Amino acid sequence: MKNVLSIQSHVIYGHAGNSAAVFPMQRLGINVWPLNTVQLSNHMQYGHWAGSAIDAAKMEQLVDGIAAIGALKRCDAVLSGFLGSPPQARAAVEIVRSVKAMNPNAWYFCDPAMGQTGGIRPEPGVEEFMVQEMPALADGMSPNHTELQKLAGRRIETVAEAVEACRALIRRGPQIILVKHLHDRNSPADRFNMLAVTETEAWIGQRPLYAFPRHPVGVGDLTSAIFVACRLRGDSVRAAFEHTLAAVHAVVKATYDARRYELELVAAQDEIARPSEWFGAWVTDA
């Protein structure tokens, strides 16, 4: 069984960061080692919250503890999400390097959270670190549309421009770019677009877009987690992309149908493992 170290925020109530990522990856057959960068009562969109961030040095100490018992060499991948400060981002880099030193076959997937995540906004300097440092280290990245524009340093309005931006990013280091949410001026307003790009291929997929009164938090964290889990279990990029598209849709639909604000992860757990509705991805020649 594969093991992933997941470095993200955490909420006690609800689903965001590791609280949205850990269970779906486990449901897909992956052992998850959660390292919480932030511990909050709930995500901040509620308007009231309690909690705090973990010290960056403590992050490294915790991973050193795993290494001390001889377990770090069994880590097959690192997934990072919200990193709240430049010291936390630097700690994540050192952790990835430690994992790869122990297991040269381990890979790193970076969800480059640069904007507001569950009401939390990273400190100044994190965005610059993500843009300048992370692409050279990451084996894969999963920006949303806004984050892709920041990484590429350009405005993106079409699928062709997005593919071009992803390929430019790939030339800096990553092998795979998963665009969790792509705005395309040519797409219907009721469709949600995702894009997966490698050096030689690109796939686009669409799922229904639901009109929530308040959009649930954690969908991006869920998306990255499912994609990483599918890749870890051996799925091809396209198969992982299609499974992610279908599984995330199932969770979002279950949440919408239940009229809930928090993601219905437990209710939709069978759909995460075996989605009943598939949308398929098609190759884009953009």
From Swiss-Prot:
Pathway listed for it is: Cofactor metabolism; pyridoxal 5'-phosphate salvage; pyridoxal 5'-phosphate from pyridoxal: step 1/1
Entry coiled-coil feature ranges: none
Would the keyword Kinase turn up in this protein's UniProt record? yes
The superkingdom listed in its UniProt entry is Bacteria
Task: Return the similarity comment.
Answer: Belongs to the pyridoxine kinase family. PdxY subfamily.
Listed GO cellular component terms? cytosol
Reactions catalysed, semicolon-separated, are: pyridoxal + ATP = pyridoxal 5'-phosphate + ADP + H(+)
The GO terms describing molecular function are: ATP binding; magnesium ion binding; pyridoxal kinase activity
Q: Could you tell me the gene encoding this protein?
A: pdxY
Protein name from the UniProt record: Pyridoxal kinase PdxY
| Positions that bind ATP | 111, 147, 180
Q: How does it assemble?
A: Homodimer.
Q: What is its EC number?
A: 2.7.1.35
